[in-house]
Amino acid sequence: MKSILLSTLLSSAFFTPIIDQVKPSNEVSGTTDSNSNRKIQLVILFDTSSSMDGLLDQAKSRLWEIVNESGALRYNGEVPTLEIAMYDYGNTTIHNREFVRKQLDFTSDLDLVSQKLFALRTNGGDEFCGAVIDDALDQLEWSSDPKDLKMIYIAGNEPFNQGPVKYKEACAAARHMDILVNTIYCGDYMQGIREFWKDGASCSSGDYFNINSDKKIVFIPTPYDDQINEYSNKINTTYVAYNSLGSERKGMQVRQDHNAEQMHPSVANMRAKTKISSNYSNGEWDLVDAYLADSTFIDRLKKEDLPKELKGKTAKELQLFVDVKLKE
């Protein structure tokens, strides 16, 4: 899968390296199967020390773009499932010896990814790159399938060799697990090399990039921004919350719409595109997505898990209700 997906890597802002790396260099023709067994596992390790506000802003602005790019990938006609995990490090509010904190296990819940990203805050601290890579390798449930694409992206601006865990050992362990460690230095390219960020990538067969983390992303407004955002809001009305998760997750969906809109209308547009893609699946709380994943789901659904307005309906009536929502 890697030989199909990996392409020339160039960067100018955070997430551009990731977007370029998940773009397919070749697409395999064939019938598209959205129920793929292939995975893209992507872990992002954020330096949240006090100088990294610009880095987080760039990440918030580009999240939905990388999701949309990964949704265009095909492997033998299959659409790989995107799983994202997240850590932050180098922050004094992290109360452990190595200043490393897991924010998110691997998940395909993109609203949850967005919520965690927008909740990150910066504060001064010590940045231990080897330690955060080591934790990500040990604590996450990595795929054992060699055909899956597994990548770590670590971003920061302090020497890569700091801390109690030797980065060369952590990166060698990643290489043994067939995981690429890609490093993003927030500063001058040559300074990043002097501070071992290039070596950190090379020892795991990954790639080294540098960015200006304070650079503002320029978005070009289009005449369709308002219309697309209106459609995004209409999409929300087709979601039918069920079980104990439903109400809270539907509220989260609206909050992440708002977060994207606050960044820029173009960011909201990219999120709207995500919401009509196969990557945006919410079967854990949405009746319609659950049915799309398993057409027998309605027959097994417990009545107490239904929303109030649907509790008295038969399985056949629920089927008709879902069919209407699908057409919307």
Q: Residue ranges of each PLM-predicted region?
A:
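C-terminal "exit" segments of structured domains
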Residues: 204, 208-297, 323, 328
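Residues in flexible loops and secondary-structure boundaries
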Residues: 9-12, 60, 125, 219, ...
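Short linear sequence motifs
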Residues: 7-8, 82, 273, 284
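Divalent cation-coordinating acidic motifs and surrounding scaffolds
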Residues: 19-215, 223-225, 293-303, 309-311, ...
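Compositionally biased amphipathic helical and low-complexity segments enriched in hydrophobic
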Residues: 6-11, 57, 113, 288
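Generic low-complexity, intrinsically disordered sequence content enriched
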Residues: 9-14, 67, 291, 322
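Bacterial Sec-dependent N-terminal signal peptides
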Residues: 1-27
